């Protein structure tokens, strides 16, 4: 497993991350398939969108279908018929999202099973075991994603627990002789001192890549990108930087300018299910009445299946009003492709040293305003 930075434009980078199941060109956007499926579409349709890697969730796959079923198929790739790389969240996000159903200890986390209500116990070692059997190309350490806002004292204690869990994850990952990649997750809330503490200790332990966690949980964009900028300056240049859970198009561009290489988010698929379709000229809210008789495709120059087969805005509006599953599928295909086209254009702009021009054109079209004057980074 190798990561190489191939070109830079300011702090933005184009890189190549080589995994067992394929090569990922970065910056890369990762569609979310929490339960081993990107909602509404097939694995082939995800691949046709240009996606290079999928994110799935360790915790939920452990509960359903369970490891025994996945072992029958050998790994998660064969289970979901996706032959590209897979990254799996360790279960740490569920420490945040299921906060009313869990109890944190230094040993691990007790959860109430959201399916049947039974008590289950997840530890760093167990998370590494599960991800090993899933066959994840990129494994994430077990951590706590802290809610926002939280006190300095709470986050400081959480960082220490997560550092302990990261070290245990590293030791058990190595004990399994897992030949895939192990990424650490830098926590610390909105406090630079705690982010620095987390990052420096994780760098000392040594990991294949570093994720920036604990963001997009309610903080302002200004706070978010202040932390992203700060942490990217600490992560070693030769390691991939992964910003978790952030995915608005303008946020991706800003983070790329700050030096981020990878992203995941549910926005393209969730918004598709709610009739929000992304284009180079802004968002089309397909359920609006003005599209009832609109014969145009979602976007004239889009090369996705939905636009190329000329499914009209009028038809998609009708499907949305009728709550037809075909509409969700066609919307999702378009949004997934939009995100991959955006990343392709970003990578090409970096290669040509024209990222500033690309960003200025994007901001003009979207009437988008920088939160931190990030153009100074390119």
Swiss-Prot record:
<feature type="binding site">
    <location>
        <position position="334"/>
    </location>
    <ligand>
        <name>Zn(2+)</name>
    </ligand>
</feature>
<feature type="region of interest" description="RNA binding; important for wobble base 34 recognition">
    <location>
        <begin position="269"/>
        <end position="273"/>
    </location>
</feature>
<keyword id="KW-0808">Transferase</keyword>
<dbReference type="InterPro" id="IPR050076">
    <property type="entry name" value="ArchSynthase1/Queuine_TRR"/>
</dbReference>
<feature type="binding site">
    <location>
        <begin position="89"/>
        <end position="93"/>
    </location>
    <ligand>
        <name>substrate</name>
    </ligand>
</feature>
<dbReference type="GO" id="GO:0002099">
    <property type="term" value="P:tRNA wobble guanine modification"/>
</dbReference>
<keyword id="KW-0671">Queuosine biosynthesis</keyword>
<keyword id="KW-0328">Glycosyltransferase</keyword>
<feature type="binding site">
    <location>
        <position position="304"/>
    </location>
    <ligand>
        <name>Zn(2+)</name>
    </ligand>
</feature>
<dbReference type="GO" id="GO:0046872">
    <property type="term" value="F:metal ion binding"/>
</dbReference>
<feature type="binding site">
    <location>
        <position position="307"/>
    </location>
    <ligand>
        <name>Zn(2+)</name>
    </ligand>
</feature>
<dbReference type="InterPro" id="IPR002616">
    <property type="entry name" value="tRNA_ribo_trans-like"/>
</dbReference>
<comment type="function">
    <text>Catalyzes the base-exchange of a guanine (G) residue with the queuine precursor 7-aminomethyl-7-deazaguanine (PreQ1) at position 34 (anticodon wobble position) in tRNAs with GU(N) anticodons (tRNA-Asp, -Asn, -His and -Tyr). Catalysis occurs through a double-displacement mechanism. The nucleophile active site attacks the C1' of nucleotide 34 to detach the guanine base from the RNA, forming a covalent enzyme-RNA intermediate. The proton acceptor active site deprotonates the incoming PreQ1, allowing a nucleophilic attack on the C1' of the ribose to form the product.</text>
</comment>
<dbReference type="GO" id="GO:0008616">
    <property type="term" value="P:queuosine biosynthetic process"/>
</dbReference>
<keyword id="KW-0862">Zinc</keyword>
<dbReference type="InterPro" id="IPR004803">
    <property type="entry name" value="TGT"/>
</dbReference>
<feature type="binding site">
    <location>
        <position position="143"/>
    </location>
    <ligand>
        <name>substrate</name>
    </ligand>
</feature>
<dbReference type="InterPro" id="IPR036511">
    <property type="entry name" value="TGT-like_sf"/>
</dbReference>
<feature type="active site" description="Nucleophile">
    <location>
        <position position="264"/>
    </location>
</feature>
<feature type="binding site">
    <location>
        <position position="187"/>
    </location>
    <ligand>
        <name>substrate</name>
    </ligand>
</feature>
<feature type="active site" description="Proton acceptor">
    <location>
        <position position="89"/>
    </location>
</feature>
<dbReference type="GO" id="GO:0005829">
    <property type="term" value="C:cytosol"/>
</dbReference>
<comment type="similarity">
    <text>Belongs to the queuine tRNA-ribosyltransferase family.</text>
</comment>
<comment type="subunit">
    <text>Homodimer. Within each dimer, one monomer is responsible for RNA recognition and catalysis, while the other monomer binds to the replacement base PreQ1.</text>
</comment>
<feature type="binding site">
    <location>
        <position position="302"/>
    </location>
    <ligand>
        <name>Zn(2+)</name>
    </ligand>
</feature>
<feature type="region of interest" description="RNA binding">
    <location>
        <begin position="245"/>
        <end position="251"/>
    </location>
</feature>
<keyword id="KW-0479">Metal-binding</keyword>
<comment type="pathway">
    <text>tRNA modification; tRNA-queuosine biosynthesis.</text>
</comment>
<dbReference type="GO" id="GO:0008479">
    <property type="term" value="F:tRNA-guanosine(34) queuine transglycosylase activity"/>
</dbReference>
<protein>
    <recommendedName>
        <fullName>Queuine tRNA-ribosyltransferase</fullName>
        <ecNumber>2.4.2.29</ecNumber>
    </recommendedName>
</protein>
<feature type="binding site">
    <location>
        <position position="214"/>
    </location>
    <ligand>
        <name>substrate</name>
    </ligand>
</feature>
<dbReference type="GO" id="GO:0101030">
    <property type="term" value="P:tRNA-guanine transglycosylation"/>
</dbReference>
<keyword id="KW-0819">tRNA processing</keyword>
<dbReference type="Pfam" id="PF01702">
    <property type="entry name" value="TGT"/>
</dbReference>
């Amino acid at each position: 497993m190798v990561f190489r930075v191939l070109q830079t434009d300011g702090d933005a980078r184009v890189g190549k991350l080589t995994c067992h199941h394929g090569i990922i060109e970065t910056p890369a956007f990762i569609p979310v398939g929490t339960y081993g499926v990107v909602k509404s579409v097939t694995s082939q349709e995800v691949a046709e969108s240009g996606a290079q890697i999928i994110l799935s969730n360790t915790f939920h796959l452990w509960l359903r279908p369970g490891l025994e079923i996945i072992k029958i198929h050998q790994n998660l790739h064969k289970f979901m018929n996706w032959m590209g790389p897979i990254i799996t969240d360790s279960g740490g996000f569920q420490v945040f999202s299921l906060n009313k159903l869990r109890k944190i200890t230094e040993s691990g986390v007790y959860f109430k099973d959201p399916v049947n209500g039974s008590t289950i116990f997840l530890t760093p070692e167990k998370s590494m075991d599960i991800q090993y059997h899933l066959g994840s190309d990129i494994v994430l350490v077990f951590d706590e994603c802290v809610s926002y806002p939280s006190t300095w004292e709470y986050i400081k204690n959480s960082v220490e627990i997560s550092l302990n869990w990261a070290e245990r994850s590293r030791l058990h990952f190595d004990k399994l002789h897992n030949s895939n990649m192990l990424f650490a997750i830098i926590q610390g809330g909105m406090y630079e001192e705690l982010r620095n503490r987390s990052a420096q200790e994780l760098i000392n332990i040594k990991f294949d890549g570093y994720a920036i966690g604990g963001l997009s949980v309610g903080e302002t964009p200004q706070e978010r990108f202040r932390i992203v900028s700060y942490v990217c300056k600490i992560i070693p240049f030769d390691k991939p930087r992964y910003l978790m859970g952030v995915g608005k198009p303008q946020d991706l561009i800003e983070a790329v300018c700050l030096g981020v290489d990878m992203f995941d988010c549910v926005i393209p698929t969730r918004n598709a299910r709610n009739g929000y379709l992304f284009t180079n000229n802004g968002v089309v809210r397909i359920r609006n009445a003005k599209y009832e008789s609109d014969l145009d495709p979602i976007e004239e120059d889009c090369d996705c299946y939905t636009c190329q087969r000329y499914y009209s805005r009028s038809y998609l509006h009708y499907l949305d009003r009728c709550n037809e599953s075909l509409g969700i599928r066609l919307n999702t295909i378009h949004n997934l492709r939009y995100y991959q086209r955006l990343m392709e254009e970003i990578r090409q702009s970096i290669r040509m040293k024209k990222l500033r021009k690309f960003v200025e054109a994007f901001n003009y079209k979207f009437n988008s305003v920088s939160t931190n004057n990030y153009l100074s980074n390119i």
